[in-house]
From Swiss-Prot:
One of its GO terms (cellular component) is nucleus. The chain crosses the membrane at residues 81-101, 108-128, 165-185. This is FUN14 domain-containing protein 2. It comes from Sus scrofa (Pig). The gene is FUNDC2. Belongs to the FUN14 family. GO terms for biological process: autophagy of mitochondrion; intracellular triglyceride homeostasis; regulation of platelet activation.
Amino acid sequence: METSSPRAGSQPAPTAARYFASCRAEPLRVSSRDQLAEMAAASQGNFEGNFESLDLAELAKKQPWWRKLFGQESGPSAEKYSVATQLLIGGVTGWCTGFIFQKVGKLAATAVGGGFFLLQLANHTGYIKVDWQRVEKDMKKAKEQLKIRKSNQIPTEVKSKAEEVVSFVKKNVLVTGGFFGGFLLGMAS
């Protein structure tokens, strides 16, 4: 990180001076919009001494995707909303997701089943001739390839994403519970 040199003839604001004096030994972390606004207002004046500058591009690269999307205050929802609000948000989004999933699932099942039925009908009437020996041979090849490629180790990408999901669920138990309950209700309606 680079440091800025002081400008001559300037006096720092008292609140900013206290804040910056307490942060000189440790890296600069901003936890709320109020602190950020206070720092921005204080930086309009000039400071004496050396301060670290914050490279936002580097900070953004290190943040998880949900922090980039929702901002710094996107921690556990338990800190921001009441229990009823969390359950309501989770339940409504879960119900909507379950309802849409049910409708799309029915449509997809109908399309696949109808296509299979039409293929069977075309085969039965003689429009299509299926070489069942070739199909069986190809299926055996596919089974062998799957046995060869099969491994008991989970890829690291899958493992890291699973850990992110588990962490999110642990931090937002009420929203997650409401979502799954709403999802089941949406699937049933």
